């Protein structure tokens, strides 16, 4: 007996990492075999050289692209519906119709350019350019464009009959790791509440990790997205469902983020630090896709959906307190993480190293300027019951290592007031 529970290793999507890797985009689209391309992004990024570069590369390869720039921070179901309409317009100009998305073509000789499960011969491919908002919205759009589902019916538990359109993810932040997951988070503005969209077949066909595209990020965005990635890695490592493969990836991601986030915040042109952060964020995404997340994300998503707080900001506010809450059941793992965080002492006890890990996370948060509290967003004790209700209904709690009662969540929130 190995002493290790069985688990599945499914390393997807195919990822291209390195400065200049965006040049591979036309070849990746060609491998998918799409007849039209829609770039999914946000309004701010649409006017930058990043999107201009993407569209120019595609145009030079005789792959003219339509740009949909209607994604908002914390994207909504309205964004998804508008994006699906833009895709329908793009498809109308292609030789195929949207129903052809159900076709599963024979793998091409160039198949290694994309993940083996990626649909080929689809009429439209989506290129999601941006942070987690653009990539998450693209997953909803990829489904809604070929299925009659809108609004809350986009929930990941809903049945879809036609496979999602293929997505190529081009992250421009080192944060959410959304490019490594088949699922995303969008807000239903009618509630308002965030929920999960996606399906097994909405995993990006490929992702392009070009650190040059992250150089223009301002310090506050670099800090917030970096803390998002750190939360992903830590919650993966502390998950109720760990495995040795994900453990190794998560610990290395923690190590890379702790070592490079301050440098990237201090000097946004530091390409070495940017490269380490972008790869680490992707690794954290791979790890969490195999283990799930936890309480920090459950609470953070309520804050994002109801108060429009950016994910990295919400998570960084909560992370040290959630780590302390998990300490009784994850002492050894936090002790192990202390060494990845640069705070471990080989002569210290597990208890002391675990505490040092939490202190190191809090210190890193302060160092990169993430000092906000939930009270700064107008959240009061009167809101705690709603946040608690949202958090306890979040699917990620299936992976949290220590079950939380309503009183536990209220206490965590009270510490932020």
Segments from the language model and where they lie:
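Short, amphipathic C-terminal "tail helix"
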Residues: 380-417
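Carboxylate- and glycine-rich phosphate/diphosphate-binding segment that chelates Mg2+/Mn2+
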Residues: 154, 183-291
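Gly/Pro-rich interdomain helix-loop hinge
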Residues: 306-383
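ATP/NTP phosphate-donor binding region
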Residues: 1-93, 118-125, 374
């Amino acid at each position: 007996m190995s002493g290790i529970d069985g688990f599945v290793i499914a390393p997807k999507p195919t990822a291209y990492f390195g400065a200049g890797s965006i040049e591979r985009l036309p070849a990746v689209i060609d491998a998918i075999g799409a007849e039209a391309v829609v770039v999914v992004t946000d309004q701010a990024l649409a006017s930058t050289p990043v999107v201009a570069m993407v569209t120019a590369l595609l145009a030079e390869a005789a792959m003219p692209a339509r740009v949909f720039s209607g994604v908002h921070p914390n994207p909504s179901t309205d964004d998804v519906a508008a994006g699906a309409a833009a895709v329908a317009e793009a498809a109308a100009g292609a030789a195929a119709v949207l129903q052809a998305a159900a076709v599963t073509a024979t793998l091409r000789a160039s198949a290694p350019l994309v993940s083996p499960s990626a649909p080929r011969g689809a009429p439209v491919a989506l290129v999601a350019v941006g942070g987690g908002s653009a990539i998450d919205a693209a997953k909803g759009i990829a489904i809604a464009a070929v299925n009659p589902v809108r609004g809350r019916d986009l929930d990941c538990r809903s049945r879809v009959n036609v496979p999602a359109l293929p997505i190529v993810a081009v992250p421009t932040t080192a944060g959410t790791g959304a490019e490594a997951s088949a699922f995303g988070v969008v807000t239903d503005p009618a509630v308002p509440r965030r929920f999960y969209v996606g399906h097994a077949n909405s995993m990006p066909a490929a992702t392009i990790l070009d650190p040059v595209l992250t150089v223009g990020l301002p310090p506050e965005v670099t800090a917030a997205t970096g803390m998002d990635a750190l939360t992903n890695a830590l919650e993966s490592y502390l998950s109720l469902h760990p495995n040795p493969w994900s453990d190794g990836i998560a610990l290395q991601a923690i190590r890379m983020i702790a070592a490079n986030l301050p440098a990237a915040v201090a000097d946004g042109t530091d390409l070495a630090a940017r490269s380490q952060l972008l790869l680490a964020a992707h690794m954290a995404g791979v790890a969490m896709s195999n283990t799930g997340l936890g309480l920090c994300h459950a609470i953070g998503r309520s804050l994002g959906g109801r108060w429009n707080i950016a994910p990295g900001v919400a998570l960084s506010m909560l992370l040290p307190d959630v780590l302390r809450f998990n300490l009784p059941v994850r002492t050894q793992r936090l002790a192990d993480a202390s060494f990845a965080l640069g705070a471990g002492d080989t002569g210290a006890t597990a208890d002391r190293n675990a505490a040092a890990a939490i202190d190191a996370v809090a210190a890193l948060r302060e160092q990169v300027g993430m000092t906000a509290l939930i009270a700064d967003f107008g959240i009061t004790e009167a809101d705690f019951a709603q946040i608690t209700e949202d958090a306890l209904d979040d699917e990620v709690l299936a992976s949290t290592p220590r079950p939380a009662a309503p009183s536990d969540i209220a206490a965590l929130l009270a510490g932020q007031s």
